[in-house]
Amino acid sequence: MYVIKKDGTHEEFNVQKIITAVNKSAARILYTFTDEELQFLCDFAKDKAESLKKEGITIQEMHNIVEGALEAVNPAVAKSYRDYRNYKLDFIHMMDDVYTKSQSIRYIGDKSNANTDSALVATKRSLIFNELNKELYRKFFMTRDELQACKDGYIYIHDQSARLDTMNCCLFNVGEVLRGGFEMGNVWYNEPKTLDTAFDVMGDIILSTAAQQYGGFTVPEVDKILAPYAMKSYRKYKEEFAKYADPSWTNVEAQAEKYARDKVKRDCDQGWQGIEYKLNTVGSSRGDYPFVTVTLGLGRSEFEKLISISLLEVHREGQGKAGNKKPVLFPKIVFLYDENLHGPGGACEDVFEKGIQCSAKTMYPDWLSLTGEGYIASMYKKYGKVISPMGCRAFLSPWYERGGMKPADENDEPVFVGRFNIGAVSLHLPMILAK
């Protein structure tokens, strides 16, 4: 006995193919057959096929036999099997929906996300692909119960257009990437030797890597990352001044230090200005302006404080035409507040004052207390580790160096930088409680 395929070719009757097909259908509704149920399905299908007394059975007849066997064992799996069998017809309807949405995006635009400018061709392509990806996710990945729960409003699965491909938000370890150089695309980047180059390279890294995820991209404690490159520039400018200074000048050393500090301050201001322009004008390959956050404020050294103060001043001034400057959206700034550092007489009180001035005018930075109450503060107090937000509101739970989810011992420490989270699902708790 053989099965006649859709293309007219013949294939020997094989119960193993039935087992494979029914297991796939069962998996779609999170059901697992027992060995006895699988044996029943195989015996049922074989007996039914033989009862037809035909040498060749069409694939349509075989589908009907398997469907009948599944109805006898588990009607829900039978429905899953039937749905999958008819997926080509469903696919046509799905593509029709995607086409309708694509026409709307092309000729009307899309205003659902302020970070995506649907007037741009690259963004139109991305939005259309997202519509297709969302339909594929709903059709071939979500279970029937999940679809129904979403439809009824009990849950909401975020970012359905992207969550199958990559991760959501991350705390990117820019400092580790810069250190020693790295490869991006087909080009090797050497470690920056000056602050202005470090700003340029950091901007390239952000645009490239933020496009490989769909959530918020955070550069944690950026003041500490850039400070070593500020020191390199400082030394370079001092040597430059000494090279051209007249030995007869008085206080040459003091003049060299002032010259170097002024140049580093200018590099800082221009570097942050360049970052702001880059992140708000150059769309990523994902078709949007990436949601980039930087955290700062804990650096105590001269150049760490300079980098923080410079960003706060640049953001406070805004970008645009003279007389019509406006603060930009990205990078979002989060000030890491430590009462002992930033309170009256603290080592970083001056940074705090600049943050207050910036916040009063632009509503940035956001403020994250590390010495108050709650989870974030408790981790900082116990381990001295900062949990920067990923994007605007996602905070990682601890992962310990040796113990994983739980500390191996009292000396085990949590790791946050260099980690990410997966897609979010919102629960409608009042509806769930009422149910």
Show where each model-derived region lies:
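Charged, amphipathic alpha-helical regulatory modules used
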Residues: 1-106
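Conserved catalytic cores of very large enzyme subunits
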Residues: 91, 97-435
